[in-house]
Amino acid sequence: MVVVLSNGGAVQLPWAGRVDAVLEAWLGGQAGAGGIVDVLVGDAEPGGRLAESIAHHVAQLPADRNFPGRPRQVQHREGPFVGYRYHDAAGVPAAFPFGHGCSYTSFDWTDVDVAGDGTDLRVSVTVANVGERRGRTWCRSTCATSRARWSAPTRS
């Protein structure tokens, strides 16, 4: 069974382990249904990746402690620690982390190299599609500071 979600924000998915796949379509607009069908029947690659982390439960998130707040006032006290930054800093694994996604093909990542003087960095990697189908993937790099004068995320 494949579940297709069409929603405007992250939702809890405690049942996700009991289905074959979850396709998060977000708000696809008037052309969204055609794209969803193309992915489901294999005519298009599900190349998108999550742009946010999805927690196991909303109570894991720091913003939940400040909800609902006073009438007409929302408290945003989590600072920079939202999404993957919170999960990293708190050591709380996400159900589906930032960047999660599947593909109809496979990729090999080789020749990873990071060079620089500590101020300017150059990151390079060779990515090869080693599967039988066309597909796309993406490279994500993050960095950390060891000398922050404020409470800073582990990675950013």
Predicted regions and their residues:
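Intrinsically disordered, low-complexity segments enriched in Ser/Pro/Gly/Ala and basic residues
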Residues: L5, V123, S151-R155
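Hydrophobic anchor at the start of a short beta-strand
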Residues: M1-V2
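Short aromatic-acidic-glycine turn motif
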Residues: P62, C143-S156
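Secreted, periplasmic, or luminal enzymes acting at the cell surface/secretory milieu
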Residues: S6-R136, T142-A144
